[in-house]
Amino acid sequence: MSNLKLMKVLGIETSCDETGVAIYDAVTRDIISEQLYSQASKHAEYGGVVPEIASRDHLKKLIPLIRLTVKEAGLNLRDIEGIAYTSGPGLRGPLLIGASTAKAIAMSLNKPSVGIHHMEAHLLINLLEDPAPSFPFLTLLISGGHCLLINAKSLGNYEIVGQTLDDAVGEAFDKVAKILDLGYPGGPKIEALAKNGDPNAFNLPRPMTTKKNHDFSFSGLKTAVFYEFKKINKINDVIKADLAASFQAAVADTLLMKVSSAMEKTGLNELVIGGGVASNKYIREKLVIGLEGRSIFFPPIHRCTDNGAMIAYAGSFYLKDVKQDMTLNIKPRWPLSDLNDG
């Protein structure tokens, strides 16, 4: 962990379709200012994120959000002592916008900057909560692009215990939402609709839960929803709600079984959960009930989706002894296990 004192870290998140900016005070251990802008409405008509649109919107919003974040913290930009930015994984264009902006600010202020692994930031933000987990712990990262089970042994030392072999959890939610004609983004829409449905109405598979490994597969579950949908002659809101609820229950059951098995295998009793899908209240409750007796840590709902706070906080660990470097070293594809190699 960083030994830097009196450090205020500016965090910049632009890996996909959220522009997030925050300032973390390492002395008070507080996020003292934070702004988040979502582009979801701009991508809704396309049914998913359009990289070019995302890049242009980040370019338009990032600098004003940085100014607002600094102002609301009661600071001057010169008071910032380090800059952290998402360097991967993510969309190349959006990553470049964030990285180049961070590097420009760092150079103008003669301050250090550091690139942060997006998924590690999702993992670490839980350490800011009270109570907080202690290394080592098991981590479940569930988002639009990832589904990972990780043995977090120490800072920067992560063993992949299980991962998706096809669709990520959030991706499956988006695709099922498209089948049900709910629109984008699918996660919140399915969760809302499922509240009115019967989770036992459709007998959907719990993929790979009979396998001895801890990997995931959600493509077949998505296909099962598609075939159930096609078999119905007259689709109405009740049937859609039942399908949404049944799908959501299948996902939650699958996650619970895989996590439970992984905790038994690793001997870890603390579970950290992060990523956008971790904001799903049904999944949260299912895991809490199913893992009774274990210690489970969730970030606040607003910190589950991509945000600048997690980047600023992660940056506080890595800014020690960082030298000025203007290289735009982004990594659109960046396995979390690569951090183990330094």
Residue ranges: model-predicted function:
Residues 123-124, 299-340:
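Glycine-rich phosphate-binding/hydrolytic loop that grips phosphoryl groups
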Residues 19-25, 139-141, 147-151:
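Short beta-strand scaffold segments in enzyme catalytic cores
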Residues 6-89, 118, 122:
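N-terminal beta-alpha supersecondary unit
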Residues 131, 154-196, 222-223, 227-232:
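Glycine-rich phosphate-binding loop plus the immediately following alpha-helix
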Residues 85-88, 105, 143, 272-280:
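Glycine-rich beta-strand-to-loop/alpha-helix junction loops that act as flexible
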Residues 76, 192-271, 280-289, 294, ...:
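A contiguous, well-structured pocket-lining segment that forms one wall/lid of small-molecule binding clefts
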